[in-house]
Amino acid sequence: MELRQVKGNTWVLDSWELIPLYKLDAHRCVLLDTGTWDQRDELEAALDAAGLDPVAILCSHAHMDHMGSNAYFQKTRGTQVIMSLGEAAQIMSPLGIQLQYYNFNMGAFGQYPELGTAPCLPDRILLPGEREIEIGGAQFEILPTPGHTIDHISVRTPDDVLYLADAMMTGRILHHAKFPYAISVGEYLDTLVKLREVKAAE
């Protein structure tokens, strides 16, 4: 997992799935998502190699490929987990995760032990209408981008870098998935229209 600079203090950990972060200083960072649970060791090793302690996770949405290590970092490092209200409600308990992943029954938590590490009580919940959050002296803009999930958010870093997460898919992904997953196709399309008007440096 390679740490690559995007702009200013905004960096990305480059693996098969990108994990963005914002450096608050030489030793502290804010993670924008944590990837999948099977990236955990690689992610932690990359952070340790860079001398970075994740003081917060500003999580885009409650899918396992974006919040797979939220609970782990919260428990082992005291990392603050920050999520929007609609996403936080889905991952506070095994039942919430089961309701989100309706193809899982409660027995799946025994069959897939990784699911047992996923439930997480966020330290801070972004309420509807909250458009900014201050973390460690840095100001982040919150953009509501629902559709892929019920309360998906995108984040603008202080460097004017916009992290869209799954609000918009790359051409590489669309080549394989012609129409990506959306819990609400109407809201997803509305979000895409809205994003056409959003400007950012990166």
Q: Each predicted region: which residue ranges?
A:
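Conserved beta-strand hairpin/beta-sheet module of binuclear metal-dependent hydrolase folds
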Residues: M1-A50, S154-A165
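Conserved beta-strand segments of alpha/beta enzyme cores
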Residues: E2, W11, D53, Q80, ...
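A short catalytic or substrate-binding loop motif that flags glycine-/basic-rich loops and adjacent residues
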Residues: L13-W16, I125-L127, P146-T149
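Short, basic/glycine-rich phosphate-binding loops at helix/coil junctions
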Residues: Y22-A26, A108, M168-I173
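Active-site neighborhood of phospho(di)ester-bond hydrolases with catalytic His/Asp-centered motifs
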Residues: L32-G35, P54-H63, V81-L85, P144-G147, ...
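Active-site environment of divalent metal-dependent phosphoester hydrolases
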Residues: W37-Q39, A62-M67, A88-I91, T149-I153, ...
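Active-site HxH/HxHxD metal-binding segment of metal-dependent hydrolases
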Residues: D38-D41, A46-R131
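Metallo-beta-lactamase
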Residues: E132, Q139-E202
